[in-house]
A protein has these predicted regions:
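N-terminal [4Fe-4S]-dependent radical SAM core
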Residues: 16
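Alpha/beta enzyme core
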Residues: 2, 13, 22-31, 37-331
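Catalytic domains of riboflavin
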Residues: 1-7
């Protein structure tokens, strides 16, 4: 055959493929997610997320150390309070003795600036009803989340996390105006150097299912009045631009795998770093298929992460972070 172009020439050897790779995923771009639960003496496995745990404060530190030694530069902490500490407004979220703030403080004391300590800044784990904010009657008998009252509580939570030692706060509640309000609250409290990673395009996704086991949520119903409709694309661009205008230091798309088109579009216009969250359902599907020997666990996990990175994510929140960092170094 008389061919002018033979693309296979650049696939002939492993060295050639490495030389011509268009993207390269690095451990530093992965963020390890951890759950910390109050009132336990031993870490507890999460049944719907094989290999993941609800940590105690004592087990968290060595787990973070393993992540750091693998090359991870950022962790994201979620707190799971005692049931008796939950209330209508989630007040344990900003209690300096609450489980999440104690976990932040413990990590900062142990690791200092060695890693970026990020914390989830939302109320759903801390409210008795499991919603992401303050519930009020809309005047017609339907309970809804009060946007502005909730944002006020997010500000209290963000400042408490900064005071505990968080480098980054990460509001995930999808309330209008939350970024501007939190930035002002942090600055007023003297935390101008604490950054904000905004959950800018967070969808009302069925892929979040296993996460609710991980945080033992009391949630019933849905979050469709504040999280985005999976049918929508342009709305994400509006949400991301609003967060950038309000002062977000980083923006996020969640989930990642089924929303790579959104990741791509956001990455093309965002002047700030773009994160994507490979969520619990994505993780659980890989684990379930691998447990049945239907797929190669390592190969599929890395392919999924590389796809998210290829789409434009500068960083990826994933339950595979520590393992994937080791795999990448081996490769």
């Amino acid at each position: 055959m008389n061919l002018t172009r033979r693309p296979r020439r650049l696939r002939t050897t492993a060295a050639m493929r490495a030389l011509t790779a268009e993207t390269a995923l690095r451990p530093e771009q992965l963020i390890q997610v951890f759950f910390v639960r109050d009132g336990m003496s031993e870490p507890q496995p999460i049944s719907s997320m094989p290999g993941q745990y609800q940590h105690t404060l004592e087990s968290l530190i060595p787990a973070v150390r393993q992540a750091a030694e693998a090359g991870i530069k950022c962790i994201d902490l979620f707190g799971v309070p005692l049931d008796e500490d939950k209330d209508e407004v989630g007040s344990a979220a900003w209690d300096e003795n609450g489980i999440l703030n104690r976990a932040i403080a413990a990590c900062r004391a142990e690791f200092g600036d060695e890693i970026v300590i990020m914390a989830d800044t939302c109320l759903d784990e801390f409210t008795s009803h499991g919603h992401c904010g303050v519930l009020v009657d809309d005047g017609y008998g339907t309970m809804i989340v009060d946007n502005d009252a909730t944002v006020e509580l997010y500000c209290k939570m963000a400042v408490s996390q900064a005071r505990a030692g968080a480098h980054t706060v990460s509001p995930s509640g999808m309330m209008d105006g939350q970024i501007a309000a939190m930035r002002a609250a942090l600055d007023t409290a003297g935390f101008q150097n604490v950054s904000i990673m905004a959950y800018s395009a967070k969808y009302a996704s069925a892929f979040f299912g296993p996460f609710r086991d991980a945080v033992e949520s009391s949630f019933t119903g849905n979050r469709k009045t504040y999280q985005q409709d999976p049918a929508n694309r342009r709305e994400s661009l509006l949400e991301v631009q609003a967060d950038i205008d309000e002062g977000a230091d980083m923006v996020m798309v969640k989930p990642a795998g089924s929303y790579l088109d959104i990741v791509r579009e956001v990455a093309e216009f965002s002047p700030v770093p773009v994160a994507a969250y490979q969520v619990s359902g994505e993780y659980a599907m890989i684990e379930a298929a691998a447990a049945n020997s239907w797929i190669d666990r390592r190969a599929v996990a890395l392919e999924a992460l590389r796809s998210i990175h290829r789409a434009g994510a500068d960083m990826i929140l994933t339950y595979y972070a520590t393992e994937a960092a080791r795999w990448l170094r081996e490769d």
